[in-house]
Swiss-Prot record:
Keywords: NADP, Oxidoreductase, Riboflavin biosynthesis. It comes from Schizosaccharomyces pombe (strain 972 / ATCC 24843). Catalyzes an early step in riboflavin biosynthesis, the NADPH-dependent reduction of the ribose side chain of 2,5-diamino-6-ribosylamino-4(3H)-pyrimidinone 5'-phosphate, yielding 2,5-diamino-6-ribitylamino-4(3H)-pyrimidinone 5'-phosphate. InterPro entries: DHFR-like_dom_sf (IPR024072), RibDG_C (IPR002734), Riboflavin_Biosynth_HTPR (IPR050765). GO terms for biological process: riboflavin biosynthetic process. NADP(+) binds at T68, D72, S103, N104, L105, R106, G191, A192, E193, L194, L195. Belongs to the HTP reductase family. It comes from the Eukaryota. The keyword NADP applies. GO terms for cellular component: cytosol; nucleus. Its EC number is 1.1.1.302. This is 2,5-diamino-6-ribosylamino-4(3H)-pyrimidinone 5'-phosphate reductase.
Length: 268
């Protein structure tokens, strides 16, 4: 990915892919494996959490990998002006589409928040990216068939990519098929493997990195690999965000929108 100036908010009529993640000073982004006793690795401050939810309102879809969906069970919704308050969930027409890259359809969909929220019409139905060889097994595998049935029961769909293990990140996430379905603006929130695959792609348009003033042990946390493939040296800006700092190639309009939201909730 070559770093160039990205304009905010992104146009609704053209492809725009954002990579965004939060990391500690020593580059840790989450726990290696799910740990009920530890919970989710808490990184972002209240202020940067607001920034993330502001971003979500400007995108058609939010993409995560299957490991993030399993470990964190995110709702992938937008809540403003206070993301921590369930009553601040925005109307359905302002919600992004959850996109989960689950190549093997291995997730327990009955337990996922995105399924429950879609059923309750509080969130949009999800799109699930699936490998073609797995899709061919659906009619003969009761567990796979049940997963597809559950996804479809809430209005969700499976998007079948062209190859099982493509080299290209864009092919891996079926970017062309997402665009064909009107999902032009895509916000990729993780996890580490999905982000690492994206760093060499020419289809990435923007990045927003939240760096938090914390240090975590390397023994039970993970980092993002292949960061050297992401050119962060030009056309980038540093912005304060509470105790955190934001590193991005978005234009100043991005930070101005964020500051407006902090002082005026009507800016949503």
């Amino acid at each position: 990915m070559e770093s160039s100036q990205a304009y905010f908010p992104p146009s609704a009529n053209k492809k725009h892919v954002l990579l965004t993640w939060a990391q500690s000073i020593n580059g840790r982004i989450g726990y290696v494996v799910e740990s009920p006793s530890l919970g989710q690795l808490r990184l972002s401050s209240k202020e940067s959490f607001v920034m993330t939810h502001l971003l979500r309102t400007k995108f058609d879809g939010i993409m995560v990998g299957s490991r993030t969906a399993e470990n964190d069970n995110p709702s992938l919704t937008a809540k403003l002006p206070d993301p921590a308050n369930p009553d601040c969930l925005l109307p359905l027409n302002k919600q992004p589409i959850p996109i989960i890259v689950d190549s093997n359809l291995r997730l327990d969909y009955a337990s996922l928040k995105v399924i429950r929220l879609a059923r309750e019409r509080l969130g949009k139905p999800p799109l699930i990216i699936v490998a073609p060889s797995i899709w061919q097994q659906v009619q003969h595998d009761s567990k796979l068939k049940e997963a597809v049935k559950l996804i479809q029961s809430v209005g969700g769909r499976c998007i079948i990519r062209n190859e099982d293990s493509p080299d290209s990140w864009s092919d891996y996430v079926a970017l062309d098929k997402l665009l064909q379905n009107g999902v032009n603006r895509i916000m990729v929130e993780g996890g580490a493997e999905l982000l690492a695959k994206a760093f060499g792609s020419t289809d990435i348009d923007a990045y927003v990195v939240t760096i938090v003033p914390k240090i975590f042990s390397c023994s039970n946390t993970t980092e993002i690999k292949n960061l050297n493939n992401l050119n962060l040296t030009t056309n980038s800006h540093w912005y304060p965000c509470g105790p955190d700092v934001i590193f991005t190639n978005y234009s100043d309009e991005f930070y101005e929108s964020y500051k407006s939201l902090l002082t005026n909730s009507d800016a949503i």
